[in-house]
Every structure is written in C-alpha cells, then in structure tokens.
C-alpha cells in the first residue's frame, strides 16, 4: 500500500469525538476561583470611560482622515503647484498676524477721535457702509467693525448700527451671490449628493436650522455666499434668520465698549476695576466661543437626522412604486425641492439596486462554442439581451418553432446580482 494511503487510513481510524467528557472537578482544577468572572460587572467599562474613549477615537479618526487627504492631495500636485501651496500658507499666516497687529493699532488710532466721532452722523453712516459691504464674499473684517462700533458709539448705539447693517448686508449678499453663483449651484446639485441632501433638509425646519447656522462660528461673508447656493432657502427667510440672531451681535459691541473704558481710564481706574473689565471681556469671549461650538455640533447632528429621515421617506416611496410597477412621480410641487429630492432618489436607487436588477428580467450572455474569438465577441454583442416571461407579436415561441433545421449549441450564463 502506498505511503499516502497508509497515512489516510491511520487518520480515518482515529475517534471522531474526545475520549470522555471532562468532569466538574477537572473544570475546578483547570480554572482557579479568581478566574470566574461575575457577569455584567467585570470587563465592563463605565459610561464615562466609554464616552471618553469614543470621543478620543473620533478625534483620532478625523485627524487620520484629514492627514490622508492632505497627503493624497499633495502627491497629485506638480512642483509649481506645491510651491504655490506653500506660498499660500505662508501668506495666510502673515496676513493673520498682520490683521491682529492692525486691529490693535486701529483702537490706538481711534482713541483720540472716538469722543468726537461718537456724535457724528457721518461717522455713523460710514461705519454702517463698512459693515454692509464686508457682507459680500470674500471680504473680511466684519467682527472688527462690530468691535469698532461698540468702541466709538457704545454698546447699544453700536449694536444698533452693527445689527441693521448686518441684516441688510447679508440679505443683499445672499441675493447677489445666488445670481452670480447660479451655474455653480446647478453643477453642485448634479454632482454632489450630500449637497442635495443638505438642501433638502432645510424644507423641514428651515428657519430653525438657518438660525443655528447663523449662530455657528463660520466666516461671515463666506457663509452668506455658501447658504445662497441652497435652492430651498429664500432670501427673506435668510434675512429673518439673521435678524433673529442679532442679540449675538451684542458680544463684539460690548467688548468694544469695555476696551474704550480701559483705554480712557487706564490711569484713573483701580486694579480691581481693570480686573473686572478684563474678566468680563474674557468671559464674554469664552461664552461666545463655547456657544458657537455647541450650536455647531447641534447643527451637524440635526442636519444628519433630517437627511436620514428624508432618505428613509424617499426609499419607502421608491420601494412602493417598484412593488406596484408604476413610474415614480414628483416628490414635491416646489421645483427646487423636487429637483433636490430627485437627485437624492437616484442615489437611493443606486444603493438599493433598482437600476441594476429587475425581478422580472434576467440578463443572458450567450457564448458560441466555435472557439473563435471574433465570433464569440460578436455573439456577446448581438445576442445579449433580456429574458422576459411573456411574448409579444414580434417574438418567436420556442415551443412552437422547435430547434430549427440547423441548430447550434449554446451555453447560457445568467449573471444575476443579488438585491
């Protein structure tokens, strides 16, 4: 008997199950008393540890993805593009430092004339125009002008100037940006499904979500241009949302008024008064930053919730229409909402697989056995079709016609993708 057969025979002669079951005593010997874990008590981290670990993992994951995207983008750039990118980063840093230095010099320059300009209507109008025009992207300086308004005119008069110019400026910027960026909006709606989903979420609680967006710490002029690209947002609604959040504008006006008090009474003010004013400025900035960050997180969570709800509604509608074998109708009477929903519906159809698979149709690929590559390619090209379980007047019945006089043998390979 060959060696291979002998080894196989020995393997088959071995028992299929263990010789005996272990006794409880053996279990006690193998496992010490401290090895027995109390269920639901051991190896279960506390909620605070789980939340900390989850938050840390999210930060690490986001940083890893951002680093990967930066490396991927960097590899695609040629030499001169890399030089330009490095130059742009250096220029942005220098501009930021210069803006901070310039802002400090502005208050030093305004200190001698602030008392005179406080009663000047021309100064009020000029500063109002400055706040109005920085609403258009990509201009900057909106927050600085708000602080200057509080520095010159005080907290309440400065807030009135700042709020009215902000509401009118943001509304006009919204209208102009939508007119100029109309082609860009159409391209974004067609290419980016996330853009269509975000635009569609604004139809639920659009005013509430717009107010949350306006409270987020986003660049002011850029935010005006970005929100204008959502076709479901109307200019009056955007202006109303901006007017609702105008109490937020008291923060820069208050900071400006405190800075003026510190600059005017720095020789006469006691250390305690200085500490109170400085602490009030720091506390106001901290509250503004924390509130902006919190609202930003809540805005993202609400947008994801509304997007999931909209996708679920569209998915149910698609499945119902598919089961009833009827074409999809319009999703809304509003053309902008219907456009965004239709784009999102195509994305859902691709996810579900309605575009790639039909229960009544099976793709057949007919391969000729002749062995010729040319004939095989032509057969696949001309004889690939869809099998249907009913016949029309133009289709032939194989049970009536038979195999024919000159029959050929084919292999039928069905390629069916599971749903």
Swiss-Prot record:
GO terms for cellular component: Golgi membrane. The chain crosses the membrane at residues 83-103, 122-142, 159-181, 236-256, 275-295. It is a multi-pass membrane protein. Residues 1-82, 143-158, 257-274 are lumenal. GO terms for biological process: mitotic spindle elongation; vesicle-mediated transport. The keyword Transmembrane applies. Its main location: Golgi. Residues 104-121, 182-235, 296-419 are cytoplasmic. It comes from the Eukaryota. Pfam families: VTT_dom. Keywords: Golgi apparatus, Membrane, Transmembrane, Transmembrane helix. Signal peptide: none annotated. Residues 150-259 are annotated as: VTT domain. Residues 1-49, 365-419 are annotated as: Disordered. InterPro entries: Golgi_membrane_TVP38/TMEM64, VTT_dom. It is found in: Golgi apparatus membrane. Residues 387-411 have a biased composition (Basic and acidic residues). Belongs to the TVP38/TMEM64 family. The VTT domain was previously called the SNARE-assoc domain. As there is no evidence that this domain associates with SNARE proteins, it was renamed as VMP1, TMEM41, and TVP38 (VTT) domain. Golgi membrane protein involved in vesicular trafficking and spindle migration. This is Golgi apparatus membrane protein tvp38. It comes from Aspergillus clavatus (strain ATCC 1007 / CBS 513.65 / DSM 816 / NCTC 3887 / NRRL 1 / QM 1276 / 107). The gene is tvp38.
